[in-house]
């Protein structure tokens, strides 16, 4: 597998899937798709999004390589659609001290997808539009983008490296 160095602190751990021929079971993708996921290594470590279930194993290999023995402090969930969030519960089980960051609608959908017990309430960090999360030298600011695709979509702006 391959971890992609974005910067000294930001690594791409996503997976290219060249075996899929239809995106969302309807749109032809002759060269496949990319499931994007990132790790930010700082005083606190954050994982941005997971990947589709069909890419779990190579993604976990990339993640293990990128973390290099560290445990993640946060999983930031930008979007709950399965190609972005299929591994949320699995990752939460692998790292029981990791907190999960999302907005209120994110957790509503998460409970519907994985069950209300998948992510304990005390592990949830509910953010509002415009709020920030400091990782140390890097800060994530959350910007809501409802209905860009789904109602709970948000994006993260990393203020240090832009």
Each PLM stretch: what is its role?
Residues 43-44, 71, 96-97, 119-122, ...:
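Short coil/turn connectors at secondary-structure junctions
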Residues 4-8, 102-153:
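Metallo-beta-lactamase
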Residues 3-65, 155-158, 162:
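Conserved beta-strand hairpin/beta-sheet module of binuclear metal-dependent hydrolase folds
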């Amino acid at each position: 597998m391959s971890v992609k160095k974005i910067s000294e602190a930001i690594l791409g751990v996503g997976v290219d899937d060249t075996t899929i021929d239809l995106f969302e079971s309807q749109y032809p993708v002759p060269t496949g798709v990319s499931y994007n996921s990132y790790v930010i290594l700082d005083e606190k470590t954050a994982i941005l999004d997971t990947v589709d279930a069909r890419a779990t194993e190579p993604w976990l290999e990339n993640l293990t390589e990128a973390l290099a023995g560290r445990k993640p402090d946060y999983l930031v969930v930008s979007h709950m659609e399965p190609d972005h969030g299929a591994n949320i519960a699995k990752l939460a089980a692998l790292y029981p001290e990791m907190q999960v960051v999302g907005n209120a609608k994110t957790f509503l959908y998460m409970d519907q997808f994985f069950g209300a017990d998948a992510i304990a309430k005390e592990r949830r960090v509910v953010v509002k539009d415009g709020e920030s999360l400091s990782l140390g030298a890097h800060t994530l600011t959350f910007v809501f983008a409802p209905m860009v695709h789904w109602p709970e979509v948000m994006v993260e702006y990393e203020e240090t490296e832009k």
